[in-house]
Amino acid sequence: MVDEKVIVDEVETRDAYRVAYVIHFLLGAGSLIPWNALITAVDYFGYLYPDKHVEKTFTVAYMSCSVLVLVLMMTWNTRMSYRVRMNLGFSMFIIAMMISPLIDWVWKGEKGENVSYMLMVGSVVLCGLADGVVGGSLIGSAGKLPRQYMQAIFAGTASSGIIISLLRIATKASLPQTPQGMRTSAHSYFIVSSTILLCCFISCNVLHKLPVMQQHLKFHQPLHSTLTIWMVGRKIKWPASGMLIIYSVTLSIFPGFIAENLKSQLLQSWYPILLITVYNISDFVGKSLTALYLWQSIKSATWACIVRLLFYPLFSACLRGPKWLRTEVPVVVLTFMLGLTNGYLTSVLMIMAPKTVHASEAELAAIFMVVFLGLGLVCGSVIGWLWLI
């Protein structure tokens, strides 16, 4: 099915005190903080725009723009350096994150305001564009580095979900459940998220000065010709297909189906927030497990991605099946497994795929994988929008 011969990592420059690892972890977290911030504030946006399918609209807008940028990065040989692209992306993230509180301060929490809703969707589009710039640059760069840096990035992306979920729970629980309390908690939530992104902005300017990154830049060779793109694509077509399936399944269920379709009389408005937190924790566990055990067979990992299609009938049973399945416990268990398998298989494929090609093609292979990850996100968000589960 696929050539499973893996090229051994090149000898790396010593990463003193694991600074480069920590920064890659932080940048991975920062790259997904805006997305997690938007979907975890589901209660706030549901209050402001009760007649809109906020989760599904945000997902399609964000993912479509991200994939567009990734495709352009893969096919167009940009002259912007890694550092410039990262600075641009995080600047766009910070601006987009501050739009939500600014909108609320101007309209003072008026519900159903169409102009504010369009501006909010515009900020989501800006986040999606920034995600493509940051994600493509960061993962493409890590594709040429030793495998622990790719693992650090994806562990970081998963940790961002936990950080944001806990932050949302803290801000929601610490203030009264009134319209004003909800607005104040959301303001604090987005401002703290922006502060974390500012730390990422500073860190990416430190990263390029480290010896391990100097080694990476020294051997950097742009290979973005059309011929090379498809040559590399053919070599990693199976892990890329696996990535497409992973995120088509995940995004068609999470967050839209979980946030909108599943209800709990016991937990009420806390239910979607707690389910999103469970998913984020299990996703982090899955992406961290590759530091302990890395599944070496890309063929087997790709088949495991196909097996995840079973989540469709299982979640459907939790919505329409027997009464005992339409309770909180089965949903929490399934959500945990959805996140765990998503995290582990993503990390395995993203670590292994760039190592199955020549070192000079590793960056392009990593970007190619991210493009298919993004295509999976778009497919999943569209399936979720069409209510096919």
From Swiss-Prot:
It comes from the Eukaryota. Expressed in stems, flowers and siliques. Induction: By nitrogen deficiency and 5-fluorouracil plus methotrexate. InterPro entries: Eqnu_transpt, MFS_trans_sf. The chain crosses the membrane at residues 19-39, 57-77, 87-107, 119-139, 150-170, 187-207, 238-258, 266-286, 331-351, 367-387. It is a multi-pass membrane protein. The keyword Glycoprotein does not apply. Keywords: Cell membrane, Membrane, Transmembrane, Transmembrane helix, Transport. Pfam families: Nucleoside_tran (PF01733). One of its GO terms (molecular function) is nucleoside transmembrane transporter activity. It is found in: Cell membrane. Its main location: membrane. One of its GO terms (cellular component) is plasma membrane. May be involved in nucleoside transport. PANTHER family: EQUILIBRATIVE NUCLEOSIDE TRANSPORTER, EQUILIBRATIVE NUCLEOTIDE TRANSPORTER 8. Belongs to the SLC29A/ENT transporter (TC 2.A.57) family. This is Equilibrative nucleotide transporter 8. The gene is ETN8.
